[in-house]
Regions:
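Domain-level signal for soluble alpha/beta catalytic cores
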Residues: 1-341
Length: 341
């Protein structure tokens, strides 16, 4: 894909139940509102999406209850990648709907990165011996480099499989890195983080992306700039301090895009509020995007939602109410971006 900025995408998760009908509905809606690179609707938790199928083929990895995982011993990396059905869904859907395929520039897949996956796996007693507790109250796999490295190898093969499907943007979502890297790094070295991320991304030959939530420290920014990632994807609406962290030269000197979160995804209920009360107006979004253009340059920007919308399912009593908020936010984001092209 040539260097062309100011295209639109989204992070992935949507606030509706994980059904085939909802997958079809959400993907179609993303295309029809004008998202340039729609992501497959991520309708299950980002960690169990990969850890659950892995627990069925990695014997020491157990899912003791839904979304709770324990590792008890060393393990062999599986021979075949797991969780490919989401990419296959997009490929098959667009084959069946060529009219919709003609309306988009490409597709996006959201995968979960090795550090974040490892942070969600608890260690059994044998593996946790001698490890000091930091950040977490329990021993977790992220504290052991060899486990993180194995997860990177696993995600590399999943990324390669998605790349081979022809998916254009493939993101390794790594929200835990915002906690891991502040003024200093917990558990690992800078070189290990760069090497591990590059390994996880190495199967992706199109547009590898990394999504990290929250405030980005200058140290984390500099680490990510040294990786092979092409798109650095961060929250700006919720964490406006990130405007002070990134400069245009960071992107141009390192040949990166900045995916700028433009609509807020972390919401609190307001008494008596309707759907539109939660949705940013087009004029507001035009001004917000213009701020990014002035700072970073139109050709260096990707416009997207702050994070995924999946958490809204718990924020509001009605799934349909939450879903309409998400879709209307994205629609206004697209309209604002098109007016600034």
């Amino acid at each position: 894909m040539k260097k062309e900025g100011l295209f639109t995408t989204c992070v992935g998760s949507m606030p509706i139940s994980n059904t085939e009908e909802n997958m079809n509905r959400a993907f179609k809606d993303l295309i029809e509102i004008g998202i340039d690179f729609p992501c497959y609707p991520q309708l299950e938790a980002m960690n169990s999406q990969f850890l659950s199928p892995l627990s069925k083929i990695i014997e020491p990895l157990e899912e003791t209850e839904p979304e709770v995982f324990y590792l008890g011993d060393d393990f062999k990396i599986p021979d075949k990648p797991v969780a490919l059905e989401y990419g296959e869904f997009m490929v098959n859907y667009l084959k069946e709907h060529p009219d919709l395929k003609d309306r988009i520039k490409g597709t996006k897949a959201c995968l979960t990165g090795p550090f974040t996956l490892a942070s969600e796996v608890f260690l059994r007693e044998e593996l946790s011996k001698g490890i000091d507790l930091k950040i977490f109250n329990e021993h977790r796999a992220i504290m052991l480099s060899w486990i993180v490295d194995k997860f990177a190898e696993i995600m590399k093969e999943i990324g390669r499989a998605y790349n081979d499907m022809g998916i254009n943007i493939i993101s390794m979502d790594e929200p835990i890195l915002g906690l891991l890297v502040g003024r200093k790094i917990f558990f690992h070295t800078e070189d290990f983080i760069i090497k591990t991320l590059n390994k996880a991304l190495s199967g992706i030959k199109t547009m590898p992306s990394i999504h990290v939530c929250g405030r980005i420290s200058p140290y984390l920014r500099d680490i990510l700039l040294q990786t092979d990632v092409k798109i650095m994807d961060h929250e700006f609406r919720t964490s406006e301090v990130n405007f002070k962290v990134f400069e245009k030269k960071h992107l141009e000197d390192n040949d990166k895009y900045l995916a700028m979160g433009t609509v807020q995804t972390n919401l609190s209920p307001k008494k008596g509020a309707g759907i539109d009360d939660y949705v940013e107006k087009v004029d507001f979004l035009k001004n917000y995007i213009t701020r990014g253009i002035d700072l970073y340059g139109k050709d260096n920007l990707v416009i997207k939602s702050d994070c995924g919308f999946g958490a809204l399912k718990k924020t509001f009593e009605s799934e349909e109410f939450a879903y309409q908020i998400a879709i209307r936010k994205l629609k206004n984001m697209v309209l604002a971006t098109k007016e600034l092209k």
